[in-house]
């Protein structure tokens, strides 16, 4: 992140002037609007975090981000993922509040670039030798992991939170993913598919 910040200027944090380029887009009449249910989605009554960020959360991010029992994360990941909040605006505003938070935004963009330049990582390991891992892939253990019934309290709490709210604290996500792959020796793609579900 030091190299990234070394070349960062105010220009990079300004909103991109895309309106003047909109005339280059293909003009089409919109088709009928298809609702989420028609696409196979089911309303679960879950609410997404708002896209407003709290300065206090960002200020305390370094100290509180790894503590699952406090609201120490921004909960903006869904908005960053789908572009409903501007990464440039967030970096410009939040970067001055907490360097650690800015570093996390940089890491996010780094992995976006990995996906762009190495699209095979969607279904394969980045390092080919990791594709030779002999996974156990025990279906009973995987079902227990999915349900939050492993007997490991933090893993179970994280999976139950995910199953009931659609959210899991970042540090807990790392713990449950590591548990799945390194303790249970279950292929990471199984876990990824469950998280995407």
Which stretches of residues belong to each language-model region?
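Glycine/tryptophan-enriched, flexible segments
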Residues: 2-130
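Active-site-proximal binding-pocket segments
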Residues: 72-197
């Amino acid at each position: 992140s030091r190299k990234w910040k070394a070349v960062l200027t105010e220009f990079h944090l300004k909103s991109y002037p895309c309106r003047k380029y909109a005339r280059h887009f293909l003009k089409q009449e919109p088709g009928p609007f298809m609702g989420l249910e028609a696409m196979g989605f089911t309303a679960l009554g879950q609410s997404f975090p708002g896209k407003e960020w709290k300065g206090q959360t960002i200020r305390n991010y370094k100290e509180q981000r790894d503590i699952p029992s406090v609201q120490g994360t921004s909960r903006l990941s869904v908005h960053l993922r789908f572009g409903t909040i501007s990464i440039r605006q967030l970096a410009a505003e939040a970067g001055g509040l907490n360097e650690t938070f800015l570093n996390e935004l940089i890491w996010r963009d780094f992995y976006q670039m990995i996906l762009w330049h190495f699209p095979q990582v969607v279904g394969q390991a980045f390092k080919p030798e990791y594709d030779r891992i002999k996974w156990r892939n025990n279906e009973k253990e995987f079902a227990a992991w999915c349900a939050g019934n492993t007997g490991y309290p933090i893993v179970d709490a994280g999976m139950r939170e995910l199953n009931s709210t659609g959210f899991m604290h970042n540090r807990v996500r790392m713990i449950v993913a590591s548990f799945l792959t390194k303790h249970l020796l279950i292929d990471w793609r199984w876990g990824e598919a469950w998280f995407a579900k």
